Amino acid sequence: VTETAVEATRSWLNALSLADSNVAAGELYRSLFTLNRTELKPGTREKILEVYRNPVNTVTASLQSHLGQQPLPLSQNSRRSAKIVRELNREMAVGYKTVVVGLHGSWRQRLFRKSTALPIERALRYLGELLVHCYHVYMPYPPLVWLEVHELFRYAQQLQLESVPVEITSREGAGTTSIKERYSQICLLGLCNPYRLPQGEAKKVHTFLYQWAGMADIQVPAGAESQSGNFSIDLLRDGPPMKSRQPVSAGMAKRVRVLDASSLVEKTKSFIRRLEQGEPASQLPLGTECLDSACLEMFRRVLRSWDEASLRQHNRSRGKGLVSVCIGIESAHFFADGQRPFLPPEEIVVASEDMGDSGVTDSDEHSYIDFDLPIESDTEKPESAEAVVKDNFHITRWKVVDQSASGMLLRSREAPGMQVRVGDILGIQFDVAADSVWWPAVVRRLQGDAKGIVEVGVELLASHYEPVTVRVANGSAIFRPALLLPPLETTEHRRPQSLVFSRGAFRDPAGLQLSIISGDKVRNVRPLKLVERSGSFEQVYFADLMEADS
């Protein structure tokens, strides 16, 4: 039985044990579901929902803390937990939207126009929490969520309520916000390619934006060409804002708004400069908690999303067939090395071996490809074969959904040994023949659904790689497996040879001399430039050392 009086609701919630978050979440969901389908006066419903806020926020935060670091596919229990968090946020949003609808045209709204600001802000808040939760666990967000977000903001603009202060008292802290700030926070997160962010980073960016989204402005289009840091919001589109450099046509002006984030872009650049200069992240007013290097990498990713148009560089075509995939550097090394266990060389004779010109120049830059692709809503079942298990390494079979010159969208059903995260290195084999070449790739985008189906957008790093052994030169350091990627020269890009090894395998690799061992050949090199660092790997360009230098 759901209580429909404020004090009775308060008493029931005070007696509800939150020790078991899953049980408490189920009780809260059932009660909210019934409440939202019960006739109540708007004022009474709003007061009851305000009482629900703290227990709902507490339970969802507890469940999310257990979900945030799990690879895909999630276990069945974790998928149930993820679903209940999503539905709790949805029901809270439904409740506050019901208040807004009940107030529309009422005497209370006519006399106390600003009273509508609170339920609009709260509905936006929980729709935003629904979205960030889906990004956090890489699950698809429900259809029409973005359309509801835009509609609430448009309604607030009609009532001239978008800048009215709204009180907040929750785990966010006490203070005030506004509908425009809340809407900007949601839109800016949607512009970060959130399904491409490493695990846990969507929530960190969301928290950062809670403090700094007020620096963004939302304007009616002026007709001029869009500037850097400006984004187009189509209020009638079920999707996040888009990067657009074209002027808004007269026919679209009524339904389009311009999100001007240029000031926030400059603020983010200033944080990057201060972190690069060695200031601790804990001493900067970021509004979110992260380690120094992790903060720097996060802000660089955010800046790439906001400051540059992330246009797809290659046309994509529908894929066909299956590929074999192994996940992780050690696994990629194992299968490319003929499934031989990694054994450090017993004796190394240092000799210089010319394995190619590294050709590094200061102008070389890593190219980032956008694979922000939606999951197709077809009913075709992806193929998945049983894992091939040896020494805890696995091969799984993935369907090629589409592909381009530089990447692919792959889909598979959960299988033993399948654990994948954004930023993981993959080995991909296009032919099932035992001697077929393995291609190196990195997971750029990740999404999974409630049925255990996983989709990954991958960037191909090269057409092949060589499994090698690496250690600090002239020392007794531990031998590490690594992947040696060949140079690439095309009309569009010029990339020298590079090494890929596990993150943290070498402390400050840029200042080290490394020995690359391939069979009985040894090559002494010096890392020159960090190309990329993800949560699981580091990729560096390097130059060969002359014999006198080594």
Language model regions located:
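Generic N-terminal leader/targeting and pre-domain segments
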Residues: 1-163
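Intrinsically disordered, low-complexity regions
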Residues: 10-13, 25, 29, 233, ...
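Context-gated lysine
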Residues: 41, 47, 83, 97, ...
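Extended, domain-scale alpha-helical bundle/helix-rich regions
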Residues: 161-349
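Short strand-loop-strand
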Residues: 298-299, 305-437, 445-550
